[in-house]
Amino acid sequence: MSHYSMIDTYFSLDEDETETYLYLCRDLLKNKGEFQCTRDAFKFLSDYACLSAANQMELLFRVGRLDLIRRIFGQTWTPDSCPRYYMPICSPFRCLMALVNDFLSDKEVEEMYFLCAPRLESHLEPGSKKSFLRLASLLEDLELLGGDKLTFLRHLLTTIGRADLVKNLQV
């Protein structure tokens, strides 16, 4: 993975896409300490060659930036077009959380934060942006959410009236 492609990706993604990209990379960034900004996280991924070109194409595909795949790598990419020996970098759980994030409105995310307030009280930073992926990360840290722990999320989605998304969690 060249530094150029990481730099190009960093400058091309908007704030929400960057959050999704880094959430999908969370397993790679875990136990590496806290990054002061997203630029530091991208620098870490670039400096330590955590992502191959195929991995970065998968992440951009999951974020929905097919235009960047074509511009940076000069080709198209789909999960079916990768070789059989290629292991996906995004766990099914992280892909599912990114999918749920795409279908929630800001109002629904606010409702979820309100419902989780007693549990998150000491973990929330005042004035920080509230997003579903941030909430999912906090719930993972509190061990209330994980690949095998979706009950709490099902309850939250049912409470805010999003039974349609609960059906996606059955996978």
From Swiss-Prot:
Protein name as it appears in the record: Viral CASP8 and FADD-like apoptosis regulator
Domain named DED: residues: 1-74, 92-171
Function: Inhibits TNFRSF1A, TNFRSF6, TNFRSF10 and TNFRSF12 induced apoptosis. May interfere with caspase-8 recruitment and activation at the death-inducing signaling complex (DISC). May lead to higher virus production and contribute to virus persistence and oncogenicity.
GO biological process: regulation of apoptotic process; symbiont-mediated perturbation of host apoptosis
Record carries keyword Repeat: yes
Entries under SMART domains matching the protein: DED
SUPFAM superfamilies on file: DEATH domain
Record PANTHER family: CASPASE 10, DED DOMAIN-CONTAINING PROTEIN
Record PROSITE patterns: DED
A family per Pfam: DED
Keywords: Apoptosis, Host-virus interaction, Inhibition of host apoptosis by viral FLIP-like protein, Modulation of host cell apoptosis by virus, Repeat
InterPro entries tied to this protein: DEATH-like_dom_sf, DED_dom
Claim: Repeat is one of the keywords in the record: yes
Organism: Equine herpesvirus 2 (strain 86/87)
Subunit structure: Associates with the death-inducing signaling complex (DISC) formed by TNFRSF6, FADD and caspase-8. Interacts with FADD.
